[in-house]
Amino acid sequence: MRKTFFIICFVIIAIVLNAQKRPLRPGDIYRLQAIGDPQISPEGEWVAYTVTSIDSAKDRRNTHIWMVNWNGDQTIQMTNGTESESNPKWSPDSKYLSFTATRQGSSSQIWLLDRRGGEAIKLTDIKGDLSDYEWSPDSKKIALIIKDPLDTGKNKAPKPYVINRYRFKQDVSGYLYDTRFNHLYLFDVATKKVDTLTRGIYNETNPQWSPDGSKIAFVSNQTEDPDKNSNSDIWIIDAKAGAGAKQFTTWKGSDGSPQWSPDGKSIAYLRSTSDANYIMYDQQVLAVQNSNGGEVRLLSLSLDRPVSNLKWSIDGKSIGVLVIDDMQRYVASYDVASGKMQKIVDGNRSFTSLVAHPKNGWLTSMSEPYRPSELYAIENNNLRRLTNIHSKFIDSLSLATVEKFVSKSSDGNLVSGLLYLPPNAPKEKLPLIFYIHGGPVGQDEFSFDLTRQMLAANGYAVAAVNYRGSNGRGLAYSKAIYADWGNKEVLDILGAADYLVSKGIADPNRLGISGWSYGGILTDYTIAKDTRFKAASSGAGSALQLSLYGVDQYILQLDNELGQPWKDNNYQKYLNLSYPFLHADRIKTPTQFMTGEKDFNVPSVGSEQMYQALRSLSIPTELLVYPGQYHGFTQPSFIKDRFERYYQWFDKYLKYQKM
């Protein structure tokens, strides 16, 4: 009797607690935080990291530095200024926690927090733009990457942008008209003297000290015209003024992310699979080479999956990596001697950072479908959570359920997808929105996805489709759409639609489609090929691909994948890929177009042209241009507005009152 009573009480409590939960709302973007850039202290007792939150009054994001101890039971906020701080790093002697900030009206500088206490002090007074820094092993020097300073003479009238570069546009950066370059410098912590290590017309990035502090490896493309290829190489220079850099890698593709082994005898790095000038669909491979040169060992080539975030184990016997697999991202390690891979932690989740602990184990960040990213310790291949910044908010929500599905396209291709079902979904066919990922070389994973959760919270089933062109399924799967955009991907989307309708999940009369970037491009392609969708929202998309030549930032891809339009009848390729615009009269779907005013990635002309076409054809449409926004929106109020616009548009065409 008593046991039955307790069971009844437990059920009642569970029902009450669940009833108190609520669905996501667009205004919740102001409550979500983001965790990033974890760094372990030299003795392994503390982890510094960043937390980004939203200041609703100023309509902007703020980032500050926090610490959590390795046990995960003590958390301390280290900075709390009016401006953001980022790039936390520990001095190897463990005396300081450094970070970068733009305080006191200065450009970005390095600041120090003494671990014995006290306020942060400004260490550097750099002229130019600081983009990266790295402590020397003895904590006496810091390698800096600084962009040459602007000419800021007083009372100078604005001048026209004089452009001479082949690749002259980049989102956020704008027109690449100036002749400033990122160079490597050496900063003496005691004297504050700055020595120039590299000069010239090339950019240097990613400085990494050798363990004995005598050398610095860095990445640079020093070909005749770096704008015309992706041939970045690893270079090594002695850590002293007047030294000359020596080229370490000679692969005609791209080499990057160098990491010295703990004994300094080897360098691990990431290398492209292809040595072509540019290929969108490439996979990074883990490479290891003797630090004096010699044979290159490609440890992960046979894996046929992209790897990233390489880190040496403390004993130097293995290299940890993150592996992008089908719908997940897992932690693995490669034994350097044998080349064999071992999975450390995997499952239906997504790992996004990796740091070796100085004693044993790893530090990582991980997201799951029902929880945004938190920090975790990996010990003996087991996870232990260190941070808990999301629980209070997430636990108050009734989130969509997330499950995997596999559909078959009309040509037989099998496609992995994720289905989001709204909380407390009725047992009936639902209005369903396909929200298509961008890239195209990306994928939808078992991780927390705000956009799809937000759409599901408004009563929609939401489908994510890893169409051909996505990664996580091997190089051939990614390259399947080479110079053939909007064909196989659309077959995969339509195949998923057929499957979800056949299973009684989706109402065939209430299908919608949306996406951003390549997801917006695929939205345009799909509604031009099939009229089943009753509403669409295309974000940062394009359709008249020929008109983007020299207008967007992808000149290298266009020249290498489609060719220059005036050569070899290449213009016909561009026209074939422009069918959503050239055959806009086939579109029947009411479509909303969204774009950032300053987007140089997929410029607003792509959305404007499609809006004009549908407006001319009297198809219901609207165009939303967000002032001052780039390809990725940064202003919180505009992100909230975008969700509200999704609701308004899809509700208008996909929801109806039952008779």
Predicted segments, located by residue:
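Active-site-proximal cap/loop segments of hydrolase catalytic domains
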Residues: 467-659
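Non-catalytic accessory segments flanking enzyme active sites
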Residues: 39, 143-145, 152, 170, ...
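Residue-level detector of Asp-centered blade-edge/turn motifs that repeat once per structural unit
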Residues: 42-43, 92-93, 137-138, 211-212, ...
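Hydrophobic beta-strand positions that form the internal "hydrophobic ladder"
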Residues: 44-47, 94-98, 142-143, 216-217, ...
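Cap/lid segment of the alpha/beta-hydrolase catalytic domain
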Residues: 274-276, 389-509, 516, 550
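Short loop/turn segments that connect beta-strands within beta-propeller blades
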Residues: 69-73, 114-118, 188-192, 238-242, ...
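A flexible loop/linker signature enriched in serine peptidases of the S9 family
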Residues: 51-64, 79-85, 98-111, 119, ...
